[in-house]
């Protein structure tokens, strides 16, 4: 059969060469690109009228904006954020993006929040093991998922409505936007905590990114 259309989800994950390879499969193929964070080339072509584009600005019914906090990393803040979610029967993503120290962070969280049932997920795990952990988290056998950025895409857990991101100053604006989008996928109020070093040792550019993601929390 002939290819008549192509759908590209998450434009930012595909480079120009990759897209051209897909288009060469069939010259007259129709291309539909879906993205919340378009790459500059795609955005520019749309704004200049080279490509048609539509904006979906209406949030799903009963969806609430994620409340976003930028704060220095403190044990008290972490415990309060986790417990608030657990007390309403919800789940938490705790993002620690250094696999070699993730078990140390697990031990710290177990001491800090002994009430939590913690699972670990990262990209260096065997595929079957990772699938098992994610399935158990979805089924609420665990209420805190200590993870890497592996959760950035393809994860939809409506009962997970708090995300805590360590060293948020190290992430780009688009990535922070994607990570924050893992929560707030139901009618419950969701929270995102972007943690920075307690000593304030991060760049001015990082501060600008954090200020921007905190300011741009409205839906649509």
Question: What is each of the regions a protein language model found here?
Answer:
Residues 215-220:
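C-terminal or mid-to-C-terminal helical accessory/interaction module adjacent to the motor/catalytic core
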Residues 1, 5-6, 10-211:
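Inter-lobe coupling/hinge segments of SF2-like helicase ATPases
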């Amino acid at each position: 059969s002939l290819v008549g259309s192509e759908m590209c989800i998450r434009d930012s994950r595909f480079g120009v060469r990759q897209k051209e390879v897909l288009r060469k499969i069939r010259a007259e193929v129709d291309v539909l690109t879906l993205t919340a964070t378009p790459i500059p080339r795609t955005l520019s072509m749309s704004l200049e009228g080279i490509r048609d584009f539509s904006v979906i600005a209406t949030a799903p019914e009963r969806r609430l904006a994620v409340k976003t906090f930028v704060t220095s990393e403190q044990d008290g803040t972490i415990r309060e954020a986790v417990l608030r979610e657990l007390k309403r029967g919800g789940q938490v993503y705790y993002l620690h993006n250094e696999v070699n120290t993730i078990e140390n962070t697990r031990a710290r969280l177990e001491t800090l929040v002994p009430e939590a049932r913690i699972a670990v997920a990262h990209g260096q795990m065997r595929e079957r093991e990772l699938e098992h952990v994610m399935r158990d988290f979805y089924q609420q056998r665990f209420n805190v998922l200590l993870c890497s950025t592996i959760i950035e895409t393809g994860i939809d857990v409506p009962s997970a409505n708090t995300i805590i991101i360590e060293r948020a100053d190290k992430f780009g604006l688009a990535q922070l936007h994607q990570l924050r989008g893992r929560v707030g996928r139901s009618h419950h109020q969701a929270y995102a905590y972007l943690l920075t070093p307690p000593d304030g040792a991060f760049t001015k550019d990082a501060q600008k990114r954090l200020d921007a993601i905190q300011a741009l929390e409205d839906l649509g």
